[in-house]
Amino acid sequence: MPGKIENGTPKDLKTGNDFVSAAKSLLDRAFKSHHSYYGLCSTSCQVYDTAWVAMIPKTRDNVKQWLFPECFHYLLKTQAADGSWGSLPTTQTAGILDTASAVLALLCHAQEPLQILDVSPDEMGLRIEHGVTSLKRQLAVWNDVEDTNHIGVEFIIPALLSMLEKELDVPSFEFPCRSILERMHGEKLGHFDLEQVYGKPSSLLHSLEAFLGKLDFDRLSHHLYHGSMMASPSSTAAYLIGATKWDDEAEDYLRHVMRNGAGHGNGGISGTFPTTHFECSWIIATLLKGGFTLKQIDGDGLRGLSTILLEALRDENGVIGFAPRTADVDDTAKALLALSLVNQPVSPDIMIKVFEGKDHFTTFGSERDPSLTSNLHVLLSLLKQSNLSQYHPQILKTTLFTCRWWWGSDHCVKDKWNLSHLYPTMLLVEAFTEVLHLIDGGELSSLFDESFKCKIGLSIFQAVLRIILTQDNDGSWRGYREQTCYAILALVQARHVCFFTHMVDRLQSCVDRGFSWLKSCSFHSQDLTWTSKTAYEVGFVAEAYKLAALQSASLEVPAATIGHSVTSAVPSSDLEKYMRLVRKTALFSPLDEWGLMASIIESSFFVPLLQAQRVEIYPRDNIKVDEDKYLSIIPFTWVGCNNRSRTFASNRWLYDMMYLSLLGYQTDEYMEAVAGPVFGDVSLLHQTIDKVIDNTMGNLARANGTVHSGNGHQHESPNIGQVEDTLTRFTNSVLNHKDVLNSSSSDQDTLRREFRTFMHAHITQIEDNSRFSKQASSDAFSSPEQSYFQWVNSTGGSHVACAYSFAFSNCLMSANLLQGKDAFPSGTQKYLISSVMRHATNMCRMYNDFGSIARDNAERNVNSIHFPEFTLCNGTSQNLDERKERLLKIATYEQGYLDRALEALERQSRDDAGDRAGSKDMRKLKIVKLFCDVTDLYDQLYVIKDLSSSMK
């Protein structure tokens, strides 16, 4: 087995010693904070749980009083000027939960002030009015309901709204996504039999507040553990509110939370208590993976926290959760990793038996969707096993799951347990660096083929590059302390990987600037990144991340050797040659050298994937065309523009568009070199195109049956049947693409129309070229059937692949971003996106022609400059330079209209979405602009050099 990835030595011994002392202090303080009965918890106070605890009444000696008046006063202190209880930029749902629960608590106190007499009814009325107004405002613009991963939100918010409607004596709250919420509620409830809650433990016990009046709480007392319902103060509060028999143990638990939680008696209640196992494992693993050695931080604190984990795994039969009796794969895997790092390994076999699913590990029993970070924690724990080969199937499964997740993630990768994309990104870099290290050493080389290794390398490279590209000028990532730590830890890990050799100075500069910002950052600035019912910070864990980031960043830079077995990371000579052209374009000439090189390296990971599909549709070896050198540059055109604009479209979208670009070139060549000559009679070829498209649309099963490799035709002269078979494969690959079939019917119809037009335009172009080639002179097209304007807006423009590719992209957005809804729903949006497509297509044709004049003249192909409008002006013949100048002016005109159409589309999309304009509305526009950037890049490259293969 290869040696472990070694950290360097501290650059500054004094600084290193300071960090070691601080780490040992953290471990000691965390261990001493552990209560033998109630456990350990440093999670921040949450309004939501505070509100529920504020609603607990208790009757003593026939006198009813509020049990925790401090919580009520905490709510008064934390209400914002706008009536809400705060908001987070990363989640609307948390703000709605906080505001709704706090308003409900105020309503309860307004109706029964009981012993609290220092707040006037007028003030209470005003606070409630402002709170309700804020809640309605938040509900009106709520657009992340389907994306939210807050625990139990499908149960809790409907219950809260129902309670508020009853207390306020108002009809139902109406808001745009109410039907979506109700559907989610019904689907989630369908997974549970409420009667079973009285027997075995269930995740519903964590959210009992959603079931007040629906369950007999007196039958739930046996589920209490050390006074809590699944370590949830809000659920425990609901139990005390709903049960007819008072439970002193539950009251004692809440009093302990009040006194010893992050609020320290000020009325604030932690959202989860305790978080013993979570904090023990995260603190240990974070420090030891973050540059501290076991020898440096060994002591009572480290040994004490390790013992807590060992005893928990023993007492709970090999699987644990964030607290006792809350088993999940996340905390189990992290505990196994932590114990491996302190040389006290525990077998992962029980974890695998309990949580392994068909294609991923589940976090716990019933969950709406899987967790990326849970699977990464499993992978990291398995990679530390001494008998690695025993766990090859699980390592393969979690690696494949992670690759697929990253491949399909648009913009930022998301996870259900942390609001920051940087957390799963950090874990991915950490895990995949270790995977590559083991591949290099031979331990995992048999598990992964070249394509898989390509995707592992690509995932690491993109993760690190995007962290670098999104660092703020002050050295932080959006001014958040813990998220900046995640970024630094990922970058430090990347210093071991050879892919980053060409940009190591930039990488180190990012680490240094992050280090400086972090050292000056106050410990009092909260970063609420962890999710439960709302969002919270874990004090000790945040401190561990800060120390790990500072320590790892201060170590000497090691030699970057990991990843040498992934040969795709080395750009081809063809790609490097084309980069000299790219540097001359207006889009990329302002870019720093390192940034351009980074996109070149990222592109190189896609090239082998594209090469593997090179002859899937079209045979090439027996076709009289030059070598397809464009294959090397296609990935860069998409990757470079993606990074330049910081769009970060999914690899799924990027690769599909790359492949479509490849097919566009190949179709052009095939129609000219094979289909046209084989058919001879172009009218028959027109009929064949219609038949192929109609059959593909009408008989998916038949179309699927024709999909096979083009290799079968490459050593024989093609006949009409073989051409039809090839065109059927191509048509099927576009119109019956999985995501196209999952897109809206309107977007599919548009693609079908544009594709049919594209195919027929090729045949018409063949006819035009045939007539042109028979002319005595190749200087001017003497028999055009249309004016230049008509031609470029029909045959000429449609002949390039731009329009149908645009429609294809819209189908991908419909399927993957918009759950099968129209990419552009209103009539105005549809018109404007069509205008964008038309102007982009016309530009593409014009610039393509500008760059291919010499080739078209040699091959006698019709070019824009051959039309009479260019050859003559006021009866005077125009020379080549004059024609090119006029063509560029018209192309510039089209560019202006394209820009205006894009602006109008953006305005209209915002107007149609109104206040509920969310991330998906903005994402589709970003992707449209990215597509236009790629088109623009091709246009600029065509001006510099013709990219198409020449006919032999």
Swiss-Prot record:
Keywords associated with the record: Isomerase, Lyase, Magnesium, Metal-binding
Cited function: Bifunctional ent-kaurene synthase; part of the gene cluster that mediates the biosynthesis of gibberellins (GAs), diterpenoids that may provide a selective advantage during infection of the preferred host plant, rice. Gibberellins (GAs) are diterpenoids and are synthesized via the mevalonate pathway. Biosynthesis of the major metabolite GA3 (gibberellic acid) from geranylgeranyl diphosphate (GGPP) requires 13 steps.
Gene that produces this protein: CPS/KS
Recorded domain comment: The Asp-Asp-Xaa-Xaa-Asp/Glu (DDXXD/E) motif is important for the catalytic activity, presumably through binding to Mg(2+).
Pathway: Plant hormone biosynthesis; gibberellin biosynthesis
Reactions this protein catalyses: ent-copalyl diphosphate = ent-kaur-16-ene + diphosphate; (2E,6E,10E)-geranylgeranyl diphosphate = ent-copalyl diphosphate
Binding positions (Mg(2+) 1): D668, E672
Protein name: Bifunctional ent-kaurene synthase
UniProt EC number: 4.2.3.19, 5.5.1.13
MF term (GO), any: ent-copalyl diphosphate synthase activity
Disruption phenotype: Impairs the production of gibberellins.
Iron keyword on record: no
Annotated positions binding Mg(2+) 3: N848, D849, S852, D856
